[in-house]
From Swiss-Prot:
Function, as annotated: Has antibacterial activity.
Species this chain originates from: Mus musculus
Homology family: Belongs to the beta-defensin family.
GO BP terms, alphabetized: defense response to bacterium
Chief localisation class: secreted
Disulfide bonds: 30-59, 37-52, 45-60
Annotated protein name in UniProt: Beta-defensin 33
GO CC annotations, alphabetized: extracellular region
Signal peptide per UniProt: 1-20
Amino acid sequence: MRLLFLLFILLVCLAQTTSGRKRNSKFRPCEKMGGICKSQKTHGCSILPAECKSRYKHCCRL
């Protein structure tokens, strides 16, 4: 019974790790498009159509 419980816990942990990797992969396009995530108060940068992790930042062209 304990072995079954430990296997279940391991399965839950692995599922959370893979979902975390998928969540972070959608934020990579900013770097792939040649940009960097900066705060919204930054002036003088052209905004790229990519996502950043923080909702208070946008992707700026370097």
